[in-house]
Regions:
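Short, active-site-adjacent cap segments at secondary-structure transitions
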Residues: 37-39, 69-72, 129-133
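Short beta-strand segments at enzyme active-site cores
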Residues: 30-32, 61-67, 71-73, 121-125, ...
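Conserved small/polar residues in nucleotide/adenosyl-binding loops
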Residues: 159-166
Length: 166
């Protein structure tokens, strides 16, 4: 692989990159992408470019993302005032539908943007393939829960497949 063709001109030295490719080539890297980053499209586009480069270098990854600011904006648009108990947002059915919709939109934006760069990407979310099992935190919190099991079969299947598909 010719790293000079893949790496940005202002990127790190090739010998540094080679060292990390070798170190992580058999691992699945989990990247947490906060919802605040979605506010600035330029930062988002840079993130997509960087992830696409990792993919071209043979690094496997999973992106876990948030959506806090957009969730708040959508709740405000719907005139929904959030209530908090012990620092946790009380989440009724109306709120969970908005949260889910925002997060799925972000998820699709990430996947579609990666595909435009030639990166195989698959969307995993609650409406399609809910892999996270939770225990409700407390009845008064509504849909707030504690993750207690992640069914990683789908993740493992995608990680070992040569070309993931939706």
């Amino acid at each position: 692989m010719d790293l000079k063709k893949i790496l940005p001109k202002n990127g790190p030295p090739i010998n540094e990159v080679s060292k990390y490719i070798e170190k992580y080539k058999n691992d699945l890297i989990v990247i947490k992408y906060g919802g605040n980053v979605f506010i600035d499209r330029k930062i988002f586009d840079n993130f997509i470019t960087d992830i696409s480069i990792l993919n071209k270098l043979g690094i496997s990854f999973a992106v876990v993302h948030g959506g806090g600011p957009r969730i708040k904006r959508e709740l405000d648009k719907s005139n929904i005032q959030s209530k908090f108990i012990r620092g946790l947002r009380v989440t009724d059915e109306k709120i969970i539908n908005i949260v889910e919709s925002v997060l799925i939109d972000f998820n699709n934006d990430i996947v579609d943007s990666l595909k435009k760069f030639g990166t195989d990407a698959v969307s995993i979310h609650t409406k399609k393939n809910n892999i996270i099992k939770v225990t409700p935190e407390a009845k008064e919190l509504g849909f707030v829960g504690i993750p207690n099991k992640i069914d990683n079969n789908l993740i493992c299947l995608l990680y070992t497949s040569p070309s993931p598909r939706d």
